[in-house]
Amino acid sequence: MRSHFCAEISEKDVGKTIKVAGWCNTYRDHGGVVFIDLRDKSGLVQLVCDPSSKAYEKALEVRSEFVLVAKGKARLRGPGLENPKLKTGKIEIVLEELVIENKSATPPIEIGNKNVNEDLRLKYRYLDLRSLNAYEIFKLRSEVALIARNALAQKGFLEIETPILSKTTPEGARDYLVPSRVHEGEFFALPQSPQLFKQLLMVGGMDRYFQIARCFRDEDLRADRQPEFTQIDAEMSFCSENDVMGVVEDLLQEIFKAIGHNISKPFKRMPYKEAMENYGSDKPDLRFELPLIEVGDCFMDSSNAIFSNIAQDPKNKRIKALNVKGADAIFSRSVLKELEEFVCQFGAQGLAYLQIKEDGVKGPLVKFLSEKGLKNILEKTGAKTGDIVFFGAGDKKIVLDYMGRLRLKVAETLDLIDKDALNFLWVVNFPMFEKTENGYHAAHHPFTMPKNIECKDLEEIEAHAYDVVLNGVELGGGSIRIHKEEMQKKVFEKINIHEEEAQKKFGFLLEALKFGAPPHGGFAIGFDRLIMLMTKSSSIRDVIAFPKTQKASCLLTDAPSPINEEQLRELHIRLRK
């Protein structure tokens, strides 16, 4: 049906008869001469037709998004008529034959216009996908999947599918449940990850497994979350943390070659505690400096009781400083007010600061600081004339969170972030347990190997867990797993999953661990998030062919939707009114 893709035609094809197919991108009638920009997956080419052509009458019928097959001779455009924005901007095809394969209603969205309301784009996603940008995204997505498969296969990993219909197990989010027609009153769960099955594959001697896995989580959505998503999932036997990290680094190095980046190995490693204390995040963006500085000791003799009391409780409280170089000449009062309002959204009671001016240090905190305390702050933060030092004080968790967010906000405001940089980081030594209102739960998941399980303070127990971070975004992570039944039971007990409940929920795993499970560990990389970063897309929805909205609905198909009474009866379900 065609001899060339539209954007493949070049000056070497001048004089040749060309046959192309695609959609009418734009249509123009200039004094009786018809110009059509034809679009296919490769790009655009201009078709031209004057009244002397036998294709002229058909060309007059063409409108936007009509499906066309065109035949004609390639020629150079006239002087001054070239379009430097197009790959084919020096060429046009003089129409000899034109077939309208299909007509189109007037499109409700302009193809390729990102400023169109997103709900409308998602409702007509099949039209939105016609844009050249969308094609390039999904071309790269396909290439990266192939690179991942080949890279892991070369390292001896087997691609093995794990079940989609499975058993509900607590992994941090709500499960999507599927009622069983055969087993009345019982439900399957869609997997939040292949976690337990890939561990069982290691027990089964598969040694190295991977899959590009579909996962499902019924959770509140953000810009980088979807209820169904894809991850590059892998597990390996007889391995250390270093072995797993090495595989991930090799894999990411191969993947980023696809977009022309040669990333260096090994990646920097940072303990979780250091990441939180110095950057206020377990996924710090290291493309810029701006570390958080602990200055609690500078407030020990403060005349402000609130600050001095906080300074005397270093286990539970923090006073953090953020020195922003040269900010005094840039941040107006209105900007300082905006920054205060920003941190107050995340639990701050206000935003104290010191302005380092030619005639001394100014700001509301000065009167509460001793001469020694002020001097120590300036030394610790390295503050000089023209700088502003911001302070956060209070509960450790809250302060680290909002000061970490402030760090990012300031970097964005001052344009400190190199958008072309790739800064990879391993965050390691995560806490094994986190305290909640209902006791402790596993910070990663309860199948992670702890480092010091006998420690009486559960919050001090660390896990053999690791996250890989790119530019402040968690790409993925993993852990060394528990491979002995006794240890698994100990961990369950720490999070109040006692024997009866453990057997009910995880009996199959505990049973498997009795039969010589090898030491093993693995990782998962968020595939959608990876492609979002590689393409610099603003939303994860841009890199998924048919994504859900932030309300977990599909505007294209109107899913989820009601089902009829007969289907409900077959599933033994009665809906309450």
Curated annotation (Swiss-Prot):
GO cellular component: cytoplasm
Region (Aspartate): 195-198
Gene Ontology molecular functions: aspartate-tRNA ligase activity; aspartate-tRNA(Asn) ligase activity; ATP binding; nucleic acid binding
Biological process, per Gene Ontology: aspartyl-tRNA aminoacylation
Enzyme class label: ligase
Compartments where found: Cytoplasm
Keyword Endoplasmic reticulum: no
Function statement: Aspartyl-tRNA synthetase with relaxed tRNA specificity since it is able to aspartylate not only its cognate tRNA(Asp) but also tRNA(Asn). Reaction proceeds in two steps: L-aspartate is first activated by ATP to form Asp-AMP and then transferred to the acceptor end of tRNA(Asp/Asn).
Protein name per the record: Aspartate--tRNA(Asp/Asn) ligase
Keywords noted in UniProt: Aminoacyl-tRNA synthetase, ATP-binding, Cytoplasm, Ligase, Nucleotide-binding, Protein biosynthesis
UniProt KW Cytoplasm keyword: yes
Binding site for ATP: R217, D218, E219, Q226, E474, G526, F527, D528, R529
Family indicated by similarity: Belongs to the class-II aminoacyl-tRNA synthetase family. Type 1 subfamily.
Gene3D superfamilies per the UniProt record, alphabetical: Bira Bifunctional Protein, Domain 2 (3.30.930.10), GAD-like domain (3.30.1360.30), Nucleic acid-binding proteins (2.40.50.140)
Native source species: Helicobacter pylori (strain Shi470)
Record text on subunit structure and interactions: Homodimer.
Catalytic reactions of this protein: tRNA(Asx) + L-aspartate + ATP = L-aspartyl-tRNA(Asx) + AMP + diphosphate
Site (Important for tRNA non-discrimination): H30, G80
Residues reported in the UniProt entry to bind L-aspartate: E171, R217, H444, R481
One Pfam family recorded for the sequence: tRNA-synt_2
EC number of the protein: 6.1.1.23
